[in-house]
């Protein structure tokens, strides 16, 4: 019973969170970034950042921070990016954290950006390594879309890789999208533009997924009972959350109102 109540409460809270975020669309951002492979750096070192994309939810305008763009601005030839990487990365992260400073009151939606390997802390630490002083986004402003989906639909709503399967199931365009392994290969091959295009695509995908969750139209492989369980209370909660329940209750209320 306690486990069921916990699952139901987590689902309800996650749905409320999504609705609150979408209702405050003017202060909602979606973020993703690409970086060096975790497995190709010396033990304990933070991976180099290649590009960051931040999208305004209410306008779909996207702000880009990319290593190749900084190189272009500084008139550094593409083939010389590698030997100037630290300086270019520092400038890119400086621009990003200037943006953060102006948007600290905003809510930030991300996908699994949770720790020092891959996350806000990793970007902050990388900037510190390069001699910068990052502006910190408070934890209560960060919302992990990956975790919210698990809370809403259950851990089995898709197997790994969940993001790719969500894209396929919901007929979302995957043009320019690279999976983790392909991104690692792209970094090794110095394909920075390809990496950035993938980063831009992923914030676009997050936007589509968030819209579908908010409208109740996201398709998953979750069975109707999985977020609740198969106990009598779980079945009741599942039925109660279905749109038909609201229709039936409205009709019954109308009939009873006329009778009474």
Q: What would you call each of these model-derived segments?
A:
Residues 66, 79, 144-145, 179, ...:
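Short, solvent-exposed coil/turn linker segments
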Residues 6-23, 89, 192-199, 220-228, ...:
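Charged, low-complexity, helix-prone segments enriched in Lys/Glu/Asp/Gln
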Residues 201-238:
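Juxtamembrane amphipathic/hinge helix adjacent to a transmembrane helix
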Residues 2-121:
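Conserved non-catalytic scaffold segment of RNase H-like nuclease domains
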Residues 101-102, 129, 215, 259:
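Secondary-structure boundary motif
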Residues 227-260:
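C-terminal single-pass membrane-anchor helix
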Residues 50, 61-67, 74, 106-196, ...:
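Metal-dependent phosphoesterase core characteristic of DEDDh/y 3'-5' exonuclease domains
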């Amino acid at each position: 019973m306690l486990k069921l109540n916990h699952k139901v409460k987590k689902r309800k809270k996650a749905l409320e969170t999504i609705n609150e975020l979408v209702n405050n669309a003017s202060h909602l951002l979606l973020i993703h970034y690409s970086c060096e492979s975790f497995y190709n750096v010396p033990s304990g070192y933070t991976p180099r950042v290649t590009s960051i994309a931040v999208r305004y939810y209410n306008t779909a305008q996207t702000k880009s921070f990319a290593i190749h763009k900084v190189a272009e601005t500084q008139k550094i030839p593409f083939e010389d990016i590698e030997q100037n990487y630290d300086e270019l990365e520092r400038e890119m992260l400086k621009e990003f954290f200037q943006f953060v400073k102006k948007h600290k009151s905003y809510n930030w939606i991300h996908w699994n950006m949770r720790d020092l390997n891959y996350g806000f802390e990793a970007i902050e630490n990388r900037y510190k390594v390069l001699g910068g002083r990052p502006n910190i986004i408070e934890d209560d402003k960060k919302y992990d879309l990956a975790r919210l989906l698990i809370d809403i639909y259950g851990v089995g709503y898709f197997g790994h890789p969940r993001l790719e399967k969500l894209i396929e199931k919901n007929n979302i365009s995957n043009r320019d999208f690279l999976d983790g392994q392909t991104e690692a290969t792209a970094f090794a091959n110095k394909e920075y533009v390809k990496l950035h295009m993938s980063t831009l695509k992923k914030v676009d995908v997050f936007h589509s997924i968030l819209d579908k969750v908010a409208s109740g139209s996201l398709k998953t492989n979750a069975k109707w009972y999985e977020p609740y369980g198969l106990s009598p209370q779980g079945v009741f909660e599942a039925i109660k959350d279905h749109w038909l329940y609201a229709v039936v209750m409205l009709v019954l209320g109308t009939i009873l109102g006329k009778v009474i």
